[in-house]
């Protein structure tokens, strides 16, 4: 049986690792490959599309907590009925591509509705990087009062990185790292730093106060299970080393 409380424990211990399969990725075989690799590497949980059938397929094949992300109530609720263990209000890319921003008010309304429907399911909310700093902080304060379990930062994940050179890896993660740095000073909620992270920038996320990290395209651009396991195992060692270093300070 999946122990979703372990996810919250990993977050509390500042060692959470989330693997994002691609929130529009409905290639079942690819998602299963990522899920199997994630389980073998002992990451905290995986984040998949809010598709009930996909949730059922993954649940039938691996024993790892599943988070579903979205911006619509019904798909999220259906995914929970199918077995999803956690919920994330997020996946704003489709809005950004249309030059649209979800307002703080609409995010709060969505959170309230989800908490009414799924009061016992751990809930996280991604803070839109496109909001100004004042609105981001205001959103965090309201989410605290609504007792969401934790929040997530993001950046411009539309950017590409072809060569995985250090400069590009730093550039891709700059926005989410900056958001983490600012928000950790203004909220008591644990923060998952996500979007554009890599083995180079994961230590930076924890040094800035993150309680966990989200890894997406850095691993999910691969289709070979062994390759994904290798990368995630390296990330796991980095996270463990980062925590040991912080404990010695």
UniProtKB/Swiss-Prot annotation:
Keyword Transmembrane helix part of the UniProt annotation: no
Keywords, ordered alphabetically: Chloroplast, Plastid
Positions of disulphide bridges: none
The keyword Plastid appears for this protein: yes
Pfam families the UniProt entry points to: DUF561
Protein's cellular compartments: Plastid, Chloroplast
Domain of life: Eukaryota
Gene Ontology CC entries for this record: chloroplast
Principal location: plastid
Family under the similarity heading: Belongs to the ycf23 family.
PANTHER family from the UniProt entry: PTHR36895, YCF23 PROTEIN
Protein name listed in UniProt: Uncharacterized protein ycf23
Gene: ycf23
């Amino acid at each position: 049986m999946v122990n979703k409380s372990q996810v919250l424990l990993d977050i509390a211990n500042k060692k959470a690792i989330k693997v994002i399969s691609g929130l529009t990725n409905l290639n079942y075989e690819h998602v299963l490959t990522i899920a199997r690799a994630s389980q073998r590497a002992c990451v905290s949980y995986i984040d998949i599309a809010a598709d009930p059938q996909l949730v059922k397929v993954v649940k039938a094949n691996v024993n790892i907590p599943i988070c579903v992300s979205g911006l619509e109530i019904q798909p999220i609720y259906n995914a929970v009925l199918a077995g999803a263990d956690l919920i994330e209000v997020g996946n704003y890319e489709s809005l950004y591509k249309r030059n649209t921003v979800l307002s703080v008010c609409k995010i709060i309304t969505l959170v309230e509705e989800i908490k009414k429907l799924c009061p016992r399911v751990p809930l996280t909310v991604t803070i839109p990087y496109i909001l100004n700093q004042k609105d981001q902080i205001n959103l965090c304060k309201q989410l605290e009062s609504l007792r969401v379990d934790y929040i997530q930062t993001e950046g411009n994940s539309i950017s590409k990185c072809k060569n995985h050179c250090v400069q590009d890896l730093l550039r891709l993660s700059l926005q989410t790292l900056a958001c983490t740095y600012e928000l950790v000073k203004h909220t008591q909620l644990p923060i998952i730093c996500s979007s554009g992270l890599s083995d180079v920038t994961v230590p930076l996320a924890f040094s800035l106060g993150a309680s966990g990290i989200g890894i997406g395209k850095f691993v999910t651009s691969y289709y070979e299970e062994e390759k994904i396991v290798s990368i995630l195992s390296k990330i796991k060692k980095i996270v463990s080393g980062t925590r040991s270093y912080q404990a010695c300070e």
